[in-house]
């Protein structure tokens, strides 16, 4: 039987505010346990929450960016459940009237095509605390610094059909919230976490299968691995005559498996009711429109512009627009060199490899956009070859010079373009390889094509990579066939 996967994602984006959603406590990551939890966060008697207006602004800007309906009257509700790191016994969230209604987001698939993913809603809520197990020898410690941290929970429609599509969607959300400046997107610190709802059904069947929810997956790689494992688990279970039960599961990256945590709750299990301590939030049209004017050029808009303005492929445009910092870096390189394709190739190639190797974000790149643009200009005017350019790039990364020109001059790397000098070097190289020359001249066309590369390599070696490759090819062919 052929199976179809159905996936819906709930993404929790921690909003980049300095204080919590209902109190003035700080939200800084990494503070000593329980040093950023106020009486309000702890739910002490007599305390009352005060809504942080900046969280409302951030949520509305997100809603506008996904072309969603904005809830002009939205209500906070209490989500009731017991957990050790939830001191109040309830979480303040939104249920019936969220701040952001139906919207959508386009994602780029591996083949470059676009797919539209529906977004059911996005609502504001407070985070819970954190349970600590490692250092307490049979006990659990509770850190309430995170309690009350503002979250925007973004709920997708069940429009996703594979683990790769899920990753593409999460990456698109990740890029969007960073473009908007509402979340730093640091998944390692828990700023962006994902709950994956996964089910399978026979291909062609309309009704959904029973879903399992994988909680709190916090990396793109783990999202893909967790979903793929869960898909396989459910298919094998059904084909062996079993039934998938609705439950919450946890992904263990060390064992690459999901395991059951608890039965999956429904909304009525949480006994939602309007929070009596918070009035409904009423958003006027003018407030929403003023926020619309603050929206930057968004990732999909930038991708489309990169394709139309610079003639880039859909893939290149998607990679370069994935973060605002990379897009700005690329355009700064282009401003210097004027060649979009070369700029794109170097940013996505040598520069990205360097950043990955060093574990750096592009804003901390050791090679500035101006330096890279200057290097590309020296390739364009034939001052250096592409091979030498990589050596110069490495020198720039190692801070061996302020510019490509300075490094080229100091190391004597300027490309040899003098025809006489190249011919002299070729004559010496061919004389040193006389036997191979005779074999080449006696060979048929197919063998000659293979052997020609040997002579080019010897020529470039003899010139220490400085000879102009185009001239080498042209002159070498004349000499070998003359």
UniProtKB/Swiss-Prot annotation:
Catalysis: reaction(s): L-glutamyl-tRNA(Gln) + L-glutamine + ATP + H2O = L-glutaminyl-tRNA(Gln) + L-glutamate + ADP + phosphate + H(+); L-aspartyl-tRNA(Asn) + L-glutamine + ATP + H2O = L-asparaginyl-tRNA(Asn) + L-glutamate + ADP + phosphate + 2 H(+)
GO MF terms held by the record: asparaginyl-tRNA synthase (glutamine-hydrolyzing) activity; ATP binding; glutaminyl-tRNA synthase (glutamine-hydrolyzing) activity
Enzyme Commission identifier(s): 6.3.5.-
Entries under SMART domains matching the protein: GatB_Yqey
Keyword set, alphabetical order: ATP-binding, Ligase, Nucleotide-binding, Protein biosynthesis
A biological process from GO: translation
Keyword Translocase on entry: no
InterPro entries: Asn/Gln-tRNA_amidoTrfase_suB/E, Asn/Gln-tRNA_Trfase_suB/E_cat, Asn/Gln_amidotransferase, Asn/Gln_tRNA_amidoTrase-B-like, GatB, GatB_C_1, GatB_Yqey_C_2, Gln-tRNA_amidoTrfase_suB_CS
Cross-referenced Gene3D superfamilies: 1.10.10.410, GatB domain, N-terminal subdomain (1.10.150.380)
Alphabetical list of HAMAP family matching this protein: GatB
Family: Belongs to the GatB/GatE family. GatB subfamily.
Record protein name field: Aspartyl/glutamyl-tRNA(Asn/Gln) amidotransferase subunit B
